[in-house]
Amino acid sequence: MPLLYICLHNGRDTSIFANAQMFYPAAGVMLAFLLARRQGTPKRFYILHIAAAALMLAMSVLSAFLPQESWLNIANFVIIIASVLGWIFLLTEKKTKREDYGLHLHGKFLTAFAICAYFLVVKTGMVFLSVALQGGDAWAEYLTYWQSSAPWLMALVLVPNFFLSFLPFFGEEYGWRYYLTPALQGRFGARRGALAVGVLWGLWHLPLNLFFYSPDTSLQSITAQLVVCVTLGVFFTFAYEKCGKNIWLPVVLHYLNNSMVLVWTGTADISNQIISWTDVAISAIMYGVVFLPFLAAKCYRKNK
């Protein structure tokens, strides 16, 4: 957090910190498994992810003291190389190791497709509704944007881009959904465990809320972050359970949630936002209505 403050105070780009932070949850789980000498771990993939996380951390630290515009480009290059190697290591790993450590690639693909389609439709609808609430001029401008080729071309690019940049999204979901959610559900029950993970997931973003996403309206940003993480956590956990504990579905959903911002808004810049309490209230209502009903799903009715 102090490094983020230094970068912000000196007017430097803090995007690399957001990218690096996504690697840490899975890296912590993997490091713990390796140090515990657990049998049958997919060591190559684990070591790759830990090394990528360490490299991203090192670059984040260096960017605070050795400022240059190329740090983010270097980080993106590391993500691409690590993601490609990650696929190679996963696809050449023994099936039993993938199965034992939640990395299996099979699953209910039609169900997964339907869940992704639902997510895209409702999230896109939420964006359109948010713009409509801003008034006629904003609405007209937004409709003009969608009449251009830009959002459609960017949406197409996101398909191959997933395979070149999946590792940070996996980094969060393997930590939150694969490891921590079952651990807390075993202690507090299915619903309360998932909700607790959502709160922790939201608080995990605290440094970014303070120094990256919305430094000038940080309290609103923190509140909105908690709303989003709790509600999306409910849905991501439902998706994970519905498709036979397939970690790749929440990874894809997380990727869509973050990367579709480029399609929905025409920009990938999510820093220095100004968030009002009205924005927070609208977000809470929309996310609550769309995602909290999944708490009634079968996977949440066990061990209440």
Task: Name the predicted role of every residue range.
Residues 34-41, 91-99, 293-304:
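Membrane-interface capping segments at transmembrane-helix boundaries
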Residues 121, 170-198, 212, 238-246:
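Membrane-interface helix/loop boundary segments of multi-pass membrane proteins
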Residues 5-93, 111-114, 141, 151-160, ...:
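Alpha-helical transmembrane segments in multi-pass membrane proteins
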Residues 216-222, 243-248, 252-304:
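C-terminal membrane module of polytopic membrane proteins
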Residues 46-55, 194-200, 248-259:
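Central hydrophobic cores of alpha-helical transmembrane segments
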Residues 198-219:
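Membrane-helix boundary elements
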Residues 23, 113-117, 158, 162, ...:
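Residue-level signature of the transmembrane alpha-helical core
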Residues 2-10, 59-70, 129-136, 207-214, ...:
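Juxtamembrane "helix-exit" motif on the non-cytosolic side of transmembrane helices
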